[in-house]
């Protein structure tokens, strides 16, 4: 059985207050002066002070083996802050730090370790505030108002580097080869790791490490680095430094899922919901010029327009990609929303998913068997449900303590307003009818004989995504649904958490004293007219799931207050994020893919045409991380997701999976 929780570091603090690993019998940093050693070995060994002002790109990427207490990262962040203050006009504006950690510290131990370096407190406190849950995979932390990005990969570095997507090849400008000493932790210091470092290293990239062990030097040379010895720090005689002086060939391991970016930095986004809003912010942070075209007269009039939506992860014992994506998307979303400098109604009150029948009870039992961190999800017995939710249900279930609800409409509107302050241009009442290649860009034809040309286009227009010749074959479908708005009652007012059953019920929004209950589900429909039948069904599902409780029967839908919307979904419940695939070319190029994988060319896609769609019913959870993934891909930057999970988000995945098995593919 796959476990979804990472073992925390087993450590103690010695007489000097230095953290010491019990498992490896080694200190996390020098008892003498760990801060100065970091500056000497890693910053000095990679010549970063001299390189920053001369760096020809807006982003500098550092990768590290062994995050530990974060001392190297915090020291580098401090130096980068000082560089930016001294060189405000420099080309280099953002720092990206990638680090791997098999046994992450707890937040409490991290804070204790950071007490050693009071001068790093301004940066350490930001790191502690965003410290992620012990879940496997990549955790992206956006720090210093987006000037610093930290990708924390939790797990074994030798396993993780083999799972990295090809988009990370040759992206790293400097390597910090750190960790417990080779004699203490030989499993980390392998030729596989050295080869992975070379694969990720940009030509001209450097590396530095505290050790001078011969097998480390020879292994790095074998991987392709030019190595030399340098005087070690303090009492250490020698250390190693290296340079990647050659351009090594690294063939794409899964070309059918290859992701193409763009160097054009100017884009049009089609849409007006949460996907468009969050992607706009992510691209603007990377220096893009962004124009948004919305078919409606205002934002969030489609699927993103609800008053309240639940935020919690979608988990399944039998789908690893689903678990990896949604658990990390959920924790990223919480960090992202908490730091977002806009106001929107929300309450992180928790979400409880209830087992109202045998099937749902079995599903919850399977989720609980996955060894999830208690901070993510925890079992709750029937007699405790009333205590934590405020209402009786006579059901047991699973609680997501960090979940809750937010107002999608308000979030979308205010994020777009923030993006406009940062340079976003918005055009409302622009219904895109078709698009075609023109010169080196895209010609957009809107209703009313309006036209525009843009270098790059992103389709983020929900269920209307398949309305163009380039996207008409996508295997997505529409789902119409109605959310009922119900007035609170004395009993309903006691509800303290979002309840999920064969539907959902939110606590009241103090702004309007109403609850949301929903939603009806009509696959293949785009109907947005109010339905009395749907209104009654929303109420009846609640009663059917909790037949023994009186408060459910008191729910009043007679006011006919509701909102109808249409979602875009896929049969595997995962979003579609990436290049728009060329359906006809895919069938031609991959006709013999099952027999000729070794001869496969890169996935056929439309150049500079991207999509961000099929968020289904979990867009509040998935949209922030998907926006970050797509913006990173478009900007040719490191993507915060492993290769197999990224493949599960690729818009061509449902076709390619069949072609890899030699099965026929049909459109839609």
Curated annotation (Swiss-Prot):
SUPFAM superfamilies with a match to the protein in the record: FAD/NAD(P)-binding domain
Cofactors that this protein relies on: FAD
Chain intervals for the UniProt region annotation (tRNA (mnm(5)s(2)U34)-methyltransferase): 1-245
Protein name: tRNA 5-methylaminomethyl-2-thiouridine biosynthesis bifunctional protein MnmC
Cellular component terms per the entry's GO annotation: cytoplasm
A Gene Ontology molecular function term of the record: tRNA (5-methylaminomethyl-2-thiouridylate)(34)-methyltransferase activity
Reactions the enzyme catalyzes: 5-aminomethyl-2-thiouridine(34) in tRNA + S-adenosyl-L-methionine = 5-methylaminomethyl-2-thiouridine(34) in tRNA + S-adenosyl-L-homocysteine + H(+)
Region of interest (FAD-dependent cmnm(5)s(2)U34 oxidoreductase), residue spans: 270-668
GO biological process entries: methylation; tRNA wobble uridine modification
Family: In the N-terminal section; belongs to the methyltransferase superfamily. tRNA (mnm(5)s(2)U34)-methyltransferase family. In the C-terminal section; belongs to the DAO family.
InterPro entries noted in UniProt: FAD-dep_OxRdtase, FAD/NAD-bd_sf, MnmC-like_methylTransf, SAM-dependent_MTases_sf, tRNA_MAMT_biosynth_bifunc_MnmC, tRNA_MNMC2, tRNA_S-uridine_synth_MnmC_C
Record EC number: 2.1.1.61, 1.5.-.-
Gene field: mnmC
Signal peptide: none
Domain of life: Bacteria
Compartments reported by the entry: Cytoplasm
Role noted for this protein: Catalyzes the last two steps in the biosynthesis of 5-methylaminomethyl-2-thiouridine (mnm(5)s(2)U) at the wobble position (U34) in tRNA. Catalyzes the FAD-dependent demodification of cmnm(5)s(2)U34 to nm(5)s(2)U34, followed by the transfer of a methyl group from S-adenosyl-L-methionine to nm(5)s(2)U34, to form mnm(5)s(2)U34.
Entry keywords, A to Z: Cytoplasm, FAD, Flavoprotein, Methyltransferase, Multifunctional enzyme, Oxidoreductase, S-adenosyl-L-methionine, Transferase, tRNA processing
